[in-house]
Amino acid sequence: IEGYSHWNTCPSGGDNKSTAEDFDFVETLIDRIDDTYNLNSERIYAAGYSNGGMMAYGLAHYKSDLIAAIGSVSGAMLDCYGSIAHPMPVVLLHGTQDDVLPYDGNTELASVQTTLDYWINFNNTSTSPSVTTDNSGPLSVQHSVYSGGVNGVSVEHYRYQEGGHVWFDATYQGQNASELVWNFVSRYDINGLR
């Protein structure tokens, strides 16, 4: 992301590509929008694609007092962890053939399974998911649900077999990535399952 628009997904320093304080920017943005539109502060969500997915993970760690649930599409969680204020519902959508942020990780990035394990442990969900598969579209999509977490929180994963580094148009039971993320996060508020 050197030279491109990006989010700094960890606190200042480390691997950040600029000195922008993006966590503070998001908090200020939420405050300004709330001043105009009177937001429901218990139902603010973070979701993003690629580096935006990384930012969602960062917001979960460093601004969890503002964020009720997160979604990451083709994103990776970096190894900078903050103090999370409440159980955090998380949905991950990732393709097995992602050549930018590899599904199985690499020497610099955690694998999808490592990320799932982190959130499963943090939220104290079941470690044995319920799994369903939809083979009706151009990509086979496997949906794993780790339920029963603190405050009704779950961790969910959509695994797009042969999927690349994209915001997925391929559907799971008729829902595209945008719908899957929204239908997941909107079940929660800052206190857990609504």
Per-region residue spans from a language model:
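Serine-hydrolase catalytic machinery in alpha/beta-hydrolase-like enzymes
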Residues: I1-Y45, M55-G58, Y62, D169-T171
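Primarily recognizes the serine-hydrolase "nucleophile elbow" in alpha/beta-hydrolase
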Residues: D34-M88, D99
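Conserved alpha/beta-hydrolase "acid-adjacent" motif
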Residues: D99-S111
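Alpha/beta-hydrolase-fold serine-hydrolase catalytic core, especially in secreted/extracellular enzymes
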Residues: M88, D117-R194
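Short beta-strand/loop motif that positions the catalytic acidic residue
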Residues: L92-H94, D98
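Acidic catalytic loop of the alpha/beta-hydrolase fold
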Residues: D98-L101, H165-W167
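Sec-exported extracytoplasmic/periplasmic mature domains
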Residues: D31-N38, A60-A68, D117-N124, S186-I190
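Stable alpha-helical elements in mature extracytoplasmic
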Residues: D22-L29, N51-L59, K63-L66, S111-L116, ...
